[in-house]
Swiss-Prot record:
GO terms for biological process: transcription initiation-coupled chromatin remodeling. This is Uncharacterized protein C24B10.19c. The modification Phosphoserine is found at residue 328. Residues 466-493 are annotated as: Disordered. It comes from the Eukaryota. It comes from Schizosaccharomyces pombe (strain 972 / ATCC 24843) (Fission yeast). Residues 466-486 have a biased composition (Polar residues).
Length: 493
């Protein structure tokens, strides 16, 4: 593993990694979201970005309250005019001014911040660490021109353990959706995010962070987890009443500076209203933003109705396997376009199963009627053991032979009749709309298929157990096969 003492990646290398790791995003798109705050566009203006990472070495020289921090600490800045709080010993709350200088809020009088808001900051600065975990200043949730909520709650450097800890509040959910379309399960990395999340963004040169920083899957999973673990609660608690009931949509992904603005006409998700109530988009970006938002709404909507129809047939083919299987995922209901294929494969399955077992069934019937069998050895399910034992008790008696034969034939006849009715139903033409009768019939066929699959798996295992115990004598093998005959007859429809 690479340690910080051996290699110290700079900010340019980190951005280069981000551009290569976020596969769904093109390079020019990523530049819109993540940029260095000290880089300028072709018009000499600072980039408008949602998330900015700045190494300690490139912080403004006049940030005296930060000069004592370790060089591996890399704070995060959220656009220009964003407040930034550091939980250092002095408990100073700093904000980034338009000239990219850090100024403690308690010592500065910014025109866009009222006196009461400054007092809110000062009150928060005097809270204990325990209180800070449960309190959030009003200013951080409703800051003027705020597109993205304050991302940094606290950033602390522990010199003794050589670690940096931070607590995230939230980042833009639309951006997180874009960069985490196909990532691993968020639950698998939840604890990892809590432990190492700050290092991924704030401290890429720290050795533990560098290991995560070098793993695209973990970094993308971190983004996905943060969207779910943090964003939802923050948004819910800060929803504005004036936007209740507005349709679901997503905010603008990238905006020009606040100097050139005009009203946004599209409805905003209530949870995102506080990000967009005072946010304006330029006319140049309107069409681009609309196209991106439309694509996001399309990508994240439920995909159940988009499952290809050909996915249905492989699941039916899967039933021919006699090996131990896992629980299959639900499959959308069959339609008239593939009914013929499904019926054909159903018939092939049953014919193959019948041919494979007809010889064994004939030989086993003679042994069963002579009463030469004992309870099955090696079956796994207790209920199956009890069921087989009841069948054996009936069949070993003189009068029980005829009774067992009649019961098996009756069950087989009922099953064949039901299957014939279901197949006739599927062969008929049905309207495209869904009906209760259609749902019930299809559900019944799937239930039968699942039952046959389970019973054939049990039968296959019993036969395998009997063959593996062949050292105990041919008599044991015959008994095991004969006992399973009753189950075989019921599934030969």
């Amino acid at each position: 593993m690479v340690k910080s003492c051996q290699k110290k990646p700079d900010i340019d290398e980190f951005f280069s990694f981000l551009q290569s790791a976020f596969h769904p995003l093109q390079t020019e798109e990523l530049d819109t979201f993540v940029r260095n705050i000290f880089e300028y566009d072709d018009r000499g203006r600072l980039y408008n970005c949602l998330l900015t990472l700045v190494p300690y070495e490139r912080l403004p020289i006049d940030a005296e309250d930060l000069s004592s921090r370790k060089t591996y600490a890399r704070p995060v800045l959220i656009r220009q005019y964003r407040s930034l709080r550091f939980a250092n010993k002095e408990e100073n709350i700093c904000r980034l001014t338009p000239n990219s200088a850090f100024v403690p809020v308690r010592d500065s009088a910014v025109a866009s911040i009222s006196t009461s808001k400054v007092q809110d900051f000062n009150s928060y600065a005097t809270l204990t660490e325990a209180q800070k975990k449960t309190a959030t200043p009003v200013e951080e949730k409703n800051f003027l021109n705020q597109i993205v909520i304050q991302c940094l709650d606290s950033l602390e450097t522990d010199v003794e353990t050589n670690t940096t800890h931070a607590t995230l509040l939230a980042v833009d959910p639309t951006w997180l959706i874009r960069v985490s379309q196909h990532t691993c399960d968020r639950k698998a990395v939840a604890n990892l995010c809590i432990q190492y999340g700050s290092q991924i963004f704030y401290d890429p040169s720290f050795r533990n962070a560098y290991e995560l920083w070098s793993n695209p899957s973990v970094l993308l999973a971190f983004l996905k987890a943060q969207r779910v673990l943090v964003v939802s609660d923050i948004f819910t608690s800060s929803t504005l009443r004036s936007t209740q009931g507005t349709p679901m949509s997503f905010p603008n992904l990238a905006l020009e500076s606040a100097d050139n603005v005009e009203n946004v006409s599209k409805p905003i998700n209530p949870r995102m209203e506080r990000f967009s109530s005072e946010v304006k988009s330029s006319s140049i970006l309107k069409q681009q933003i609309a196209a991106v938002v439309e694509k996001i709404n399309y990508d994240i909507r439920p995909q159940r109705d988009q499952i290809p129809e050909e996915n249905i047939v492989p699941r039916i083919s899967y039933l021919t396997s006699t090996t131990t299987s896992t629980k299959s995922s639900p499959v959308p209901e069959s339609t008239t376009t593939n009914t013929t294929e499904v019926l054909k494969e159903l018939n092939d399955i049953q014919e193959n199963k019948s041919r494979k077992n007809v010889e064994k069934a004939t030989a086993a019937t003679e042994e069963m009627l002579r009463g030469h069998h004992k309870p099955v050895e090696g079956t796994t399910a207790t209920s199956e053991k009890e069921s087989i034992k009841e069948e054996v008790d009936l069949e070993v008696n003189g009068d029980g032979k005829v009774e067992a034969e009649e019961r098996i034939e009756l069950e087989s006849s009922d099953s064949e009749k039901e299957l014939s009715e279901l197949i006739d139903f599927l062969k008929r033409e049905h309207p495209p709309e869904d009906t209760p009768e259609k749902r019930v019939k299809i559900k019944r066929i799937r239930t039968l298929l699942d039952t046959w699959q389970q019973e054939w798996r049990i039968l296959n295992k019993a036969i395998s157990n009997a063959e593996s115990n062949s050292g105990r004598g041919q008599n044991s093998k015959t008994k095991t096969t004969s006992v399973n005959l009753s189950r075989n007859k019921r599934t030969r429809t």
